[in-house]
Regions:
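Aromatic/acidic polysaccharide-binding cleft in carbohydrate-active enzymes
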Residues: 264-358, 363-364
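Mature N-terminal, pre-catalytic/accessory segment of carbohydrate-active enzymes
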Residues: 1-43, 51
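Carbohydrate-binding surface patches
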Residues: 352-391, 400, 425-430
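C-terminal beta-strand-rich structural cap/linker in extracellular carbohydrate-active enzymes
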Residues: 410-432
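Glycoside hydrolase catalytic-domain groove-lining segments
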Residues: 223, 227-274, 303
């Protein structure tokens, strides 16, 4: 068994697999001013999606991002700046950009688990809703209403409309009509921007076939298609990546980007399973899982991954400790991918070692290999295998385990173009 990498052979570009949902927190107040903005910047996080931002007080809570939070009275004049409240959204998006990330803007509402709903009902007037979105985009990108020129490229229509009544209270057919109306209007108004969605919560073939049939009938443009997946096996994500790509291609959307923009470790959604999920997400095993999924999806026909969630008050945040914002183990996997992303060129590799997931990049000066040993087995054992690079040189091993946070632990001299590596279960190493 071996892992073979050829740093001299480029096979493509490293994709933005370390994007996240939500951004850092920052305030210039004199007290209660903890921030993880420098951590974001250091990790080279490329995009931050603004879904569920309004759940978080630190981002502006119920006065930020969501359409009904910005345009609070749907009967108001959508062409009047006085009808909009941009204040806290402007600050939040500015913080994301200050951290070096680009904004991926979700148009719609946060999820609503409550018995009473406020922002997930079908709009009274689909065309007017699209006009409201138009003016939000104008404010962010064209300076309208004392706005900005942020250059936000991705604009996503809605979130999880296929997820019972927590995100959309209308019928599927109502959503198809709504999406078609909004997408066609916004793409005609902003042809250079990427308009897409709808951030489906899973692979429901019946729902998706009907959705795409409607889109084709209406000639609805779709620059990107977004979908979600949660699971405990890497194959959960790679198999869904293939199914969603096949769905797009089957319906003629062959040039549409496929973006997995919610994902995380979940072994159960209730009771002990949910508790295990949350504990794992914040653990070293969760960090190995992050590195494994990013590495595996790099080789799938998926254009971007967006981890859920970097929201600072989220129980599913495996990157930053709630309250203190200390780095958790998962942060170092995201940061390691940020280094690969900065090198740009993906290098050829192959691996037949079970439960070993890897990705490699180089830029002419630096060579980097990311290796994750991820397993969901109850009693896994260490794995020893050969790493073949075809070069005789010194390599530094950086280790992420319970005792170390991606620190350089040893230097290995390759012999006859390779060396032997032993990894403990659910650890990650970077080799440079």
């Amino acid at each position: 068994m071996k892992l073979e990498v050829n740093f001299k052979k480029t096979v493509g570009k490293i994709k933005p697999m370390n994007a996240v949902n939500n951004g850092p927190v920052y305030t210039d107040n004199g007290d209660q001013n903890l921030t993880n903005l420098p951590d974001f910047r250091e990790a080279n996080i490329p995009f931050a999606r603004t879904h569920d931002s309004s759940i978080c007080y630190d981002y502006g809570g119920e006065h930020t991002v969501d359409i009904h939070n910005i345009f609070t009275d749907f009967d108001a004049d959508p062409y009047s700046p006085e009808s909009y409240d941009f204040t806290l959204t402007d600050i939040y998006l500015g913080t994301i950009m200050r951290a070096g990330a680009k904004v991926f803007y979700r148009l719609g509402s946060k999820i609503e688990h409550w018995p009473k709903h406020y922002g997930i009902m079908p709009p009274k007037d689909y065309q007017k809703w699209a006009v409201v979105c138009e003016h939000i985009i104008m404010h962010m990108n064209e300076g309208w209403a004392n706005g900005f020129h942020m250059g936000i490229e991705y604009w996503e229509i809605w979130n999880e409309p296929d997820f019972n009544d927590k995100c959309w209270t209308g019928t599927p057919e109502e959503f198809y009509d709504f999406f078609a109306t909004a997408a066609k209007y916004l793409k005609a108004r902003f042809p250079s921007l990427k308009i897409g969605g709808p951030a489906v919560c899973g692979y429901n073939e019946q729902w998706l076939d009907a959705f795409f049939e409607k889109m084709r009938e209406e000639n609805v443009p779709m620059d990107f298609y977004s979908w979600h997946c949660y699971g405990s096996k890497v194959s959960d994500f790679t198999s869904d990546a293939r199914r969603h790509r096949a769905m797009l291609d089957r319906h003629g959307y062959t040039d549409t980007e496929s973006i997995l923009n919610e994902w995380n470790y979940v072994c159960g959604w209730g009771g002990d399973g949910w508790k295990c999920s949350l504990e794992t997400e914040a653990s070293l095993k969760g960090a190995a899982f992050i590195a494994a999924v990013m590495s595996a999806c790099q080789r799938e026909k998926t254009d971007m991954l967006m981890y859920y969630d970097a929201r600072v008050n989220s129980s599913m945040n495996g990157l930053f400790k709630r309250g203190t914002l200390d780095r958790l183990k998962g942060y170092y996997s995201v940061k390691a991918w940020g280094e690969l992303l900065s090198l740009q060129d993906e290098c050829a590799l192959s691996c037949d070692v079970p439960d070993i997931y890897s990705a490699a990049a180089a830029d002419g000066e630096t060579q980097m290999l990311l290796v994750a040993y991820y397993t969901d087995d109850a009693a896994p054992l260490p794995r020893t295998f050969k790493v073949e690079t075809g070069e005789d040189r010194l390599y530094t091993i950086y280790t992420l385990d319970e005792e170390h946070d991606m620190e350089p632990l040893e230097t290995i001299a390759s012999d006859n173009g390779g060396f032997t590596l032993t990894m403990r279960p659910n650890t990650v190493v970077v080799i440079k």
